[in-house]
């Protein structure tokens, strides 16, 4: 950037290229700091050059978020989060995602769904606007993700998914994410599991584990996507079941084959440190509960 005397960042790609560019921008304005020392909230606090984000996947929402997620040398993921890292412009062009392979379409789409659902379940940081953004994203994803998966050249479905990813990203930037992400980051760090795949598998498992604490809001989402049962609990359970069914229809597994039993204590420790006390989740997990949920997500040996 300095050698070529650039005057802005133009990033075309998925979440990883965008986050890498955000990290570069942070180091550009904080030249005497290491990236790891900027981990956490509001540690950059400098205006970065104009940042233009052009997503080619509909998933991370990085084109509208404050965060850059980085994998450290110890394989642990951490986030550099600052308001200055929100891109100034986002260009949502569906033609750029038309050639995305079906499995990446599915995984990134479920990443966006996870952002929307976890933001919607946020206990403290939600506003009317973030709830509306999350609701809109969930409805759009339920309507358009599988269509985009089956027909990648369908530009209306691609455009709808890009907008849903943007809305979900905007929602969780204000309302935050939750325990699904805390566990997913450990899988990405230790095993290189694609973030969208990790979220897709974990989302129904964690929602089920939340139990009654999540039923009222999940029931509301169920109603919005056309699921109406006799009680809030039944509607919430049906919503979770439909997430599992969506995964199955798109070839996403319901468990992980990669998790080694000896890694679970470390994964639980990392997830617990990430989630607490930052994530405003319906149910606060201690390390033991994280370990139980991770074990539940592991395929039978």
What does each of the following model-derived ranges do?
Residues 175-244:
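C-terminal catalytic subdomain
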Residues 3-95:
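Glycine/threonine-rich beta-strand-loop-alpha-helix active-site module
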Residues 218, 225-301:
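C-terminal charged capping/lid subdomain of soluble metabolic enzymes
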Residues 67-175:
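Carboxylate- and glycine-rich phosphate/diphosphate-binding segment that chelates Mg2+/Mn2+
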Residues 25-28, 32, 42, 58, ...:
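Short, well-ordered alpha-helical segments in soluble proteins
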């Amino acid at each position: 950037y300095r050698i070529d005397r650039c005057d802005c960042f133009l990033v075309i790609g998925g979440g990883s290229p965008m986050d890498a560019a955000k990290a570069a921008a942070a180091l550009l304005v904080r030249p005497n700091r290491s990236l790891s020392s900027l981990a956490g909230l509001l540690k950059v606090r400098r205006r970065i050059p104009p940042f233009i984000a052009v997503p080619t996947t509909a998933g991370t929402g990085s084109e509208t978020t404050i965060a850059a997620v980085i994998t450290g040398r110890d394989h642990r993921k951490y986030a550099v989060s600052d308001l200055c890292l929100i891109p100034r412009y986002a260009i949502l062009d569906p033609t750029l995602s038309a050639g995305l392979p079906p499995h990446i379409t599915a995984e990134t789409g479920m990443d966006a769904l996870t952002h929307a659902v976890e933001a919607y379940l946020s206990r403290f940081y939600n506003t009317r606007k973030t709830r509306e953004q999350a609701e809109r994203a969930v409805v759009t994803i339920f309507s358009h993700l599988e269509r985009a998966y089956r027909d990648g050249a369908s530009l209306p479905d691609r455009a709808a998914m890009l907008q849903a990813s943007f809305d979900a990203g905007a929602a969780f930037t204000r309302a935050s994410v939750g325990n699904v992400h805390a566990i997913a980051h450990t899988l990405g760090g230790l095993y290189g599991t694609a973030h969208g795949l990790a979220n897709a598998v974990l989302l129904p498992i964690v929602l089920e584990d939340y139990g009654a604490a999540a039923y009222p809001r999940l029931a509301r989402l169920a109603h919005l996507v056309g699921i109406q049962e006799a009680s809030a609990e039944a509607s919430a359970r049906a919503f979770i079941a439909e997430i599992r069914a969506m995964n199955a229809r798109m070839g996403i597994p319901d468990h992980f084959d990669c998790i080694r039993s000896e890694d679970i204590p470390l994964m639980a420790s990392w997830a617990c440190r990430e989630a607490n006390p930052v994530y405003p989740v319906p149910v606060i997990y201690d390390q033991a509960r994280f370990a139980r949920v991770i074990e539940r997500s592991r395929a039978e040996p």
